[in-house]
Amino acid sequence: MLIPLGLLGVLGLGLAGWSAYVGRKAEEMVPAEGKFAEVPGAHLHYVELNPEAEGPAIVMVHGLMGQLRNFSHSLAGLLAADHRVILIDRPGWGHSQLVGPRPGIAAQAGMIAVLIEQLGLEKPLLVGHSMGGAVSLALALDRPQLVRGLALIAPLTQIVETVPAPFKGLLAPLALRPLLAWTVAVPVGVRTGPATAAAIFAPDPVPADFALAGGGALAVRPKSYMAGSFEIRAAPAEMAGLVARYGEIKVPVAILYGREDAVLDPQLNGEKTAAEIPGATLELIDGGHMLPVTHPEATEAWLRRLLTPPAAR
């Protein structure tokens, strides 16, 4: 019995060492490129584009297993021509570091609210993609005075009973997360990464440069597995609390969905939510879940319409 246990120990140490190596290499390939802000509970990494722009500021919040390059890959530069654009790595994601307990949706919203205040942003448009949409909704409910409105792209807005297929591997019990994160999660992620990305982007193709220019490589780290597993497990209860308060939302809310989204249901997370939030609008376009990457021009045009006063349209 001692020999097999010893072999398991050696194997585990080997996997942990290799996982750490892969994580370091990913961070070398996709390095931090912005600034860090100290907020309660986290060191937030963010990138600021065109800080002197005269147009309304835009704050962009990425989704599950993502990071700020999901926006800078294709979309943010288009908007930065005449807007101050701030891209944020959510707490625990990308290059943002936690300095306290892992935060849920509402706590992340609170941290981003502090960053908005620290940067002196005057009612920015808050753009949330996927899980970032849920965080944006929480911020609008708790700190509505900070934002001019929400622009939600393929957002998580409802209780999702069945975890989307690309993320089922994140369904780890709390007690097993560290073990899985530092042993099997990284090698499995490296092996299945292309297929997982294809499923998330479907029916749109995955850009050849997404791993680097889009930050995709950072998803294959122990840190990312831990964060993703936590959010997948915590989401149903947290979304129940948000959904119950949708009638309280006072800021303008616009939702954009791809008709062929293979990750989140546009009818549930788009149509149902637009009917529940006072004055909310929904627009559907051709495409899948990763619209900021795969359909940047259409997404930009939609965002610019939201930023243009009705009388000027």
Features from the language model and the residues they span:
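Alpha/beta-hydrolase fold catalytic core
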Residues: M1-P56, A81-H83, E122, T308-R313
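Conserved alpha/beta-hydrolase catalytic His-Asp/Glu region
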Residues: K25-A26, P164-A165, A185-E248
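Active-site loop/oxyanion-hole signature of alpha/beta-hydrolase fold enzymes
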Residues: V47-N50, L87-V127, V163, A301
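Conserved HGGG/HGGXW glycine-rich cap/lid loop of the alpha/beta-hydrolase fold
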Residues: E48-H95
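Conserved hydrolase catalytic core segment
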Residues: E122-V163
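Acidic catalytic loop of the alpha/beta-hydrolase fold
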Residues: A234-P236, E260-L264, M290
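Short beta-strand/loop motif that positions the catalytic acidic residue
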Residues: I249, I255-Y257
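Catalytic active-site module of serine/aspartate enzymes centered on a nucleophile-bearing elbow/loop
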Residues: A280-R313
